[in-house]
Structure formats: structure tokens, C-alpha cells
Amino acid sequence: MEKKMFNSLMKIHQKYQDLKQLLETDQILNDQKQYLQIAKEIASITEIIEVFQKFLDDQKVLEDAKTILIQEDDPELIQLAKVEIATMSKNIEEYEKKLLILMLPKDKNDEKDVIVEIRGAAGGDEANIFVGDLFKMYHKWADSQKAKVKVLSSSLALAGGFSQIIFQISGQKIYSKLKFESGVHRVQRVPATETMGRIHTSTATVTVMPKIDEKIEIEINPSDLKIDTYRSSGAGGQSVNTTDSAVRITHIPTGIVVTSQDERSQIGNKEIAMGILKSKIYNLELQKQQQKQSDFRKLAGSGARSEKIRTYNYPQDRLTDHRINFSTSLKPIIQGSLNPIIEALLAQEKTELILQNYANK
């Protein structure tokens, strides 16, 4: 193990011991807020400590076995020492690999819920139908994760699906699993209205944003907002409400426009629209920070129209993620079984982080 990494682990080990002692003091035991904060901090480094302790224990056994090999003349003891050295060396190598991954920098947004926006792009009616298919795919995946889905804003399309839909998924570490979904999703299939059996290509853009909680303050100057109200409408612009309950908010400095019409009241729609706006502004700043960093970790796309990340090929029952050259059967994925591709993307993220760490040394 490199000296720099070993020293870092020793510091974490000492911090763990200090926090454990602090947690048992009367001052902390009588302060529930501080107690929970320290307990959470301990939990965040417990796995690192457990693996590092195994590393230290096996390192000691290895050194003892090497000493026996040098000092002893007994053939039986020497043979046992050789077996011990081989076993401990293998264990230590595995612990080092695991610690390398555990020590990788964490994304501060990984624990957050998400707001997902899907828009029809190229392809007209077929693109809007595809938006509906993607929404169902994410909804089914969320159900499998015991996560909750709430539609925040939607615009129904005449031929089916949505021209746009914005929804929230709440659950355990949802952003960490869906942050790589941003980008252009392309579908290739024969539309139901196609009489000649020709394959059409359509696209939809997906943007995944961390949901901003109350702890994060996003400063928005009221004078930077233009707020319009209008009657909510259904597919094809048909009015479905007799009052101006729908809300459109324009953030003038960034040009971001958000709408909400699914709530019954104007107050409810304004609250939802402001929540979406805050997440969009936060996500915009997040993208700026990522652009300033190195070329690593480009998996989390910006959602730009030019950034094609995935193709859903129905005639060939094939899904391809172009960023990692990953192909698999389309049917399970479109039915919500996203975990194989999520796991492949997470594995690639870890690889890129390790490469980045070495590049920075």
C-alpha cells in the first residue's frame, strides 16, 4: 500500500476512535441533534475502518510468518509459514483493492432524491409516445426500488404519451443510481401508424436533477422572476380548468422557464414550479463545476440535444449505451429492469475515479 494512502487511513482510524469516545460523553448523550450527527459520521466511515482493521491484522500475521521463515529451521514450521504468507498476501491485496474504492471521493448529491424531466425531441408524435414509454420505464424501476413517484408537471400529447413530463422520485440514494440517465435517448421502431413497415428514429431528452432539500439555500431574487398564470390545458391545448390555476415562472438571468398545471390551486402549482426552478438552477451550477474539472466523470450527461447516450432498437430487441459500449436485451430494460445498466455505469464511474486519482498524483 502506498504511504500516502496508509497515512490517510490511519487518520481516519484515529478519527473513528475519537468520535466513538465523544459519542459516549454526557454532553453528547444529552444532545440528540449532536448525537445523531456524530453517529451518522461514524456510520459513514465504519466500512472503511472494518476493512482497514482486517488489513492491519493480516499484515501483522504476514510479518510474523516472514520472521518464522527467516529464523526457523523446522521444515514443518517453514511450510506452514509459506502457506500463511501466500494466504495473507492474497487477503491483503483484496483489502487494498476494496479500500481503494471505499476511499474514492463521494458525490455529495448521491443521497438525494431526483427530479426528472423528459421532453420529446426529434420525431413528432413518435417522440412524444417514446417520452411516455420512458416515464413508464422509470416508474416501474422506482416501484421495484420501493421508491415513490410524483408527477410535478406534464403536457399530454394528442397521439399518446407526453410532449413533456417532470416527475420526482423519492427513495434511497436515487440520484446515485439515475444521475447517468441525462442525455438524448434514441428509439428505433416501426410506429403503429406506419403502413409500409419502415423503421422510424425518434429522440427524447432526459434531464436528471438532484432534488434540493431545505438545508440547501438557493438564492433567487424575486425581481429576477417573471410569473404568469393561465388556464391549465389537456392534450392539444384543450382547456381543462375554468380558473387561472396554472403557473409559468421565468428566471430572467438564466432563461429557465418552468410550468406547473397539475395541482388544483394556483398556490400549489406555484410551489411546485419554484421547487423545479431551484433544482434546475442548482443543476446548472453543478454542470458548470463539472466542466471546470478534468475530462473524467463525463458519464453524467448534461441532457444536451447533441449528447446521444442510448439507443432503444425494438426490431433487434437491443438496448445500447454508447458511453460504455454496453448492449443488452431491450425488453427487460423498457419494463423497468434498469439495474444491469445502472450497475455497469456505476462500475465505469469507479474506474474513472480511480484513473483520475492516479492522474492527479
Curated annotation (Swiss-Prot):
The keyword Disulfide bond does not apply. InterPro entries: PCRF (IPR005139), Pep_chain_release_fac_I (IPR000352), Pep_chain_release_fac_I_sf (IPR045853), Prokaryotic/Mito_RF (IPR050057), RF-1 (IPR004373). One of its GO terms (molecular function) is translation release factor activity, codon specific. Keywords: Cytoplasm, Methylation, Protein biosynthesis. The keyword Protein biosynthesis applies. Methylated by PrmC. Methylation increases the termination efficiency of RF1. It comes from the Bacteria. It is found in: Cytoplasm. One of its GO terms (cellular component) is cytoplasm. It holds the Pfam family RF-1. The modification N5-methylglutamine is found at Q238. HAMAP family: Rel_fac_1. Peptide chain release factor 1 directs the termination of translation in response to the peptide chain termination codons UAG and UAA. Belongs to the prokaryotic/mitochondrial release factor family. This is Peptide chain release factor 1.
